[in-house]
Amino acid sequence: STRRSFIKTAALGSVAVALPAFSGFDQLEAAAFNKAIDENNMTDVEKLHIPKVTLPPVVEDGNQAPIIVESDHPMEEDHYIKSIQIMNFNDPVVIKGQCFFTPKSGQAYVSTQIRLAGGESRVWVVCDCNVHGKWAISKDVKVAAGGC
C-alpha cells in the first residue's frame, strides 16, 4: 500500500512538472483524489476528510494571499490526518506548502500566506488520511495585482 501510494504520488508529481500549463490539468488532478460529490451536502465521511479552506475569492497582493486550512478529523493513534498540501497548478511553483501531522498534533490546522501568480487560478488543498487516503477541495481565486 505504501509503495503504491509512493508510485502514484511520484507519477502525479512528474505530470505536475511536465504539464503545469495544460488547460485540463485541474480535471486530471481532481481524478487522483477523493472529492465531495456535492460540497453543499457532504456525507459524514466527506465532512471528516475534506478540509475547510478559507481563502478570499479576490486577493489584492499575490505575494501575500492568506489561507487557512483546518480539519475536524479526529487525531487518534490509528486514524489521523498525516498531511495537508496546498497547490496551484497555474503557478511556476506548484506546491505552495505542505505540513505534516501526528496524532500528538491534536488538530490538522494550517494558517499561512502563499504566493500566487496574477490572474485567475484554482488553489487545491489535499488532506491525507492514514486510513482513507487523500481528500481534496479546490477554491477559485483571482489575484488583482502582483504575484510570483
Please provide the spans of the model-predicted regions.
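N-terminal secretory signal peptides and thylakoid transit peptides that target proteins
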Residues: S1-V15
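C-terminal segment of N-terminal export signals and the immediately downstream linker at the start
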Residues: P20-V53
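Short edge beta-strand/loop segments characteristic of extracellular beta-sandwich folds
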Residues: P66-P74
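Beta-strand signatures of extracellular beta-sandwich domains
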Residues: S83-M87
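Exposed aromatic-hydrophobic patches
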Residues: Y109-R115
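Extracellular Ig-like/FN3 beta-sandwich strand-entry sites
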Residues: G118-R122
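Short acidic/polar inter-strand loop motif in beta-rich domains
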Residues: N130-A136
